[in-house]
Amino acid sequence: MERFIKEKYPQVSHIVLCGADEEAVKDADIISEATSVEKRRWPVLKPEWIKPGCLIISSGTMDFSDYDFMVKDIRKIVDNYPMYEEYIEIYEEWDENGKRLSSGIPGMYYVNMVDDGKIGRSEVTELGEILLGEKKGRKSDDEIIMVSVGGMPILDVGWGYECYCKAKEKGIGTTLNLWEKPYLY
């Protein structure tokens, strides 16, 4: 991994490889989690590893070892609340005893908290509300914030365009003709 980073990203001057979840996140100012792992084998995040004022950004899945900590001690922010409501309709799973299985997705945890009456809907902030000035961003220096970024399609369009521009710049790729004339033209 270190060789790959040095070859591909020479501007990165400081690399620390970690062998355990705690080592990677303990006392960090920012934790950015973007993992792709087997279901229910997610990285673990324990409250005692998180320092006051930490910003946690999750675009993947994680195992929060203390559900009550999520309910009581973190600021909950999502990119698109209705998207997580839809995720629950599609992806939520239950065990044979009728117990809800963890999804690993913070935004789904937040919707479940609201549905279960543990928090009010107003306790989950959407990024757009912050951008429009309807709600504050950080409320205090000690506030622990967890942002769930679940994959809005517009991000796929943006990344697709970036890939297209890079391929065009390098003269690689295959041009695909999707239509002779657009249908609604």
Please annotate each region the language model reported.
Residues 1-38:
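Glycine-rich phosphate/diphosphate-binding loop of Rossmann-like nucleotide-binding domains
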Residues 26, 51, 65-71:
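Short loop/helix-cap segments at secondary-structure boundaries that form the rim of catalytic
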Residues 26-27, 38-55:
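Rossmann-fold NAD(P) dinucleotide-binding segment
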Residues 32-33, 57-58, 78:
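Redox-cofactor binding/interface segments in oxidoreductases and associated redox assembly factors
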Residues 35-37, 60-61, 81:
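Short glycine-/small-residue-rich Rossmann-like dinucleotide-binding loops
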Residues 37-41, 49, 175-185:
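Charge-rich, low-complexity intrinsically disordered segments
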Residues 39-41, 64-65, 85-86:
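Short glycine-rich, flexible loops that bind phosphorylated cofactors or substrates
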Residues 67-183:
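Adenosine-phosphate binding glycine-rich loop
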